[in-house]
A protein has these predicted regions:
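Internal alpha-helical scaffold of NAD(P)-dependent oxidoreductase catalytic cores
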Residues: 1-31, 42-81, 125
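Short pre-catalytic strand/loop immediately N-terminal to key active-site residues, enriched for Gly-Thr
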Residues: 28-34, 85-90
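Aromatic-residue-lined binding/catalytic grooves and analogous aromatic/hydrophobic interfacial grooves
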Residues: 39
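NAD(P)-dependent Rossmann-like dehydrogenase/reductase catalytic/cofactor-binding core
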Residues: 66-134
Length: 134
């Protein structure tokens, strides 16, 4: 790497003024890009899909958009408290209930695999795009 300790401290100060800074080894930067650099688009796609599903169930688009925006805000606030997402999911999923029925479909459709492959593809693309810099 060509960055000095002073460069790192400057970047941390600038970026830290608008958010949390996590320092990772240079070898992990492509994975970070694939996960959180592309992550907002993954979440926006989930929001789009939920909005489309709500409309397909007969809800008005403007109502659906408001509900899904608030769903993401509320869910993000809960995540920000530091609780494990698995525990949060369990706390809102009653056995045999409506949420459990929906989760079963998502798991059967391999949602975890889809996200893992998306992160892997974005990570690999980051490696390709950055290859000329190494």
């Amino acid at each position: 790497t060509h960055a000095t300790q002073a460069d790192l401290e400057w970047a941390q100060a600038v970026l830290g003024s608008v958010g949390i800074v996590v320092t990772v080894p240079e070898a992990q930067l492509d994975a970070v890009t694939g996960l959180v650099g592309s992550g907002p688009a993954y979440l926006f796609l989930v929001a789009e899909a939920l909005m489309d599903a709500g409309v397909a169930e007969g809800l008005p688009r403007d109502t659906v958009e408001l509900l899904i925006r608030q769903l993401f805000v509320g869910s993000a606030a809960l995540l920000a408290q530091g609780q494990d997402p698995k525990d949060l999911r369990a706390s809102v999923t009653s056995p045999g209930g409506t949420t459990a029925a929906g989760i079963a479909i998502l798991e059967a459709q391999a949602i975890r695999t889809a996200f893992a492959e998306a992160v892997r593809a974005a990570t690999e693309r980051s490696r390709q795009l950055g290859g000329h810099l190494r």
